[in-house]
Amino acid sequence: MMLDANQAWTASEAISRTRMLEPFWPYWMEEPLISDDVLGHSRVRQALYTAIAIGENIHSKFEMATYIHSGAVDIVQADAIRMGGITEWLKVAHMADAFNLKVAPHFLLELSGSLLCGVPNALILEDVEGGSLGDLGLLEETMTVEKGLWKPSHRPGHGILFNRDALDNTKVRA
């Protein structure tokens, strides 16, 4: 059971509510507090047996470093799109690995799956319905999940083959 509070609680609420669920051994509690409350997350993490997952609303390696150094996170859920791209995501994943933390990236199955293939501390790939490039109709060829395993592309790099016509339809005039 993986729980997500979507930044809804105070530290005290997160501790008391998660403690009520701990007899059921939840795997993690995701985003229990607003994302800029590093000290609160640290307090929550120290008070619980349940792992704390955070990262989808953290936007740089510097913000994530603060979480990691403060002992405020167990599972890093960095989002390559929100964090500044592939290079920034990889820096965060390797920083997490240096502190023996696993990564479970947020959003965009196709890109996140490829990134997980390149790091030693990969944990799990999230598949949000409606939140993949394939679901958005932006791919020539969708990537598949079979028996719970994501199948990476045989193409080099991230392996994503975009549908150029679909991308043209997303242009915005500035």
Labelled PLM ranges:
Residues 106-174:
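Flexible C-terminal active-site loop/helix
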